[in-house]
UniProtKB/Swiss-Prot annotation:
One of its GO terms (biological process) is negative regulation of DNA-templated transcription. This is HTH-type transcriptional regulator BetI. Keywords: DNA-binding, Repressor, Transcription, Transcription regulation. HAMAP family: HTH_type_BetI. The keyword Transport does not apply. The keyword Lipoprotein does not apply. Repressor involved in the biosynthesis of the osmoprotectant glycine betaine. It represses transcription of the choline transporter BetT and the genes of BetAB involved in the synthesis of glycine betaine. The gene is betI. NCBIfam families: betaine_BetI, PRK00767.1. Residues 8-68 form the HTH tetR-type domain.
């Protein structure tokens, strides 16, 4: 009989091991055996909890997107009466949270983005994450701008966030957070300026 609470512990171990494997060898070369070995479990445990490698990869992407959502929401909840500018900066901060810009997370996101073009479930998860970002940004810009301008500003800021993140991920160097925050802050203030 399995120990109570082991499922969540095992799932966490396997997701962490998957991120480590993707970080070291890439998603396509990360085998079930390597992941199980890193987690200190048998390969049968992966089948038990996730069916197969694709199920484990899907759970890993869900975990990363959940961490992104939490990073953004935690910052927004700290600013319930904050200005649109502060709340937009909070959304940016959540997207540049350490859970999203660590080497393992960046490599996993790149692998998932590439795989999402061929795997419907990963595509849906990617679309949910992308739409959530755009919706959050437009909603905050909408507090101070007409609808069309808010949509354009939200789309532009989403593109800037993704672009800064992608450049860092592909450079193999850590994200320059001060530069990223400076550029996004300038974009935000430029679009919210009433001059």
């Amino acid at each position: 009989m399995p120990k109570l609470g082991m499922q969540s512990i095992r799932r966490r171990q396997l997701i962490d091991a998957t991120l480590e494997a993707i970080n070291e060898v890439g998603m396509h070369d990360a085998t079930i055996a390597q992941i199980a070995r890193r987690a200190g479990v048998s390969t049968g445990i992966i089948s038990h909890y996730f069916r197969d490698k694709n199920g484990l990869l899907e759970a890993t992407m869900r975990d990363i997107t959940s961490q992104l959502r939490d990073a953004v929401l935690n910052r927004l909840h700290a600013l319930p009466q904050g200005s649109a500018e502060l709340r937009l900066q909070a959304i940016v901060g959540g997207n540049f949270d350490e859970t999203q810009v660590s080497s393992a997370a960046m490599k996993a996101w790149l692998a998932f983005w590439a795989s999402s073009m061929h795997q419907p479930m990963l595509y849906r998860l990617q679309q949910v994450s992308s739409r959530r970002l755009l919706s959050n940004l437009v909603s905050e810009f909408r507090r101070e701008l007409p609808r069309q301008q808010a949509q354009e500003a939200g789309y532009g800021l989403a593109a800037l966030i993704d672009g800064l993140w992608l450049r860092a991920a592909l450079s193999g160097k850590p994200l320059d957070k001060p530069l990223a925050h400076s550029l996004t802050r300038h974009f935000i203030t430029q679009h919210l300026s009433t001059d």
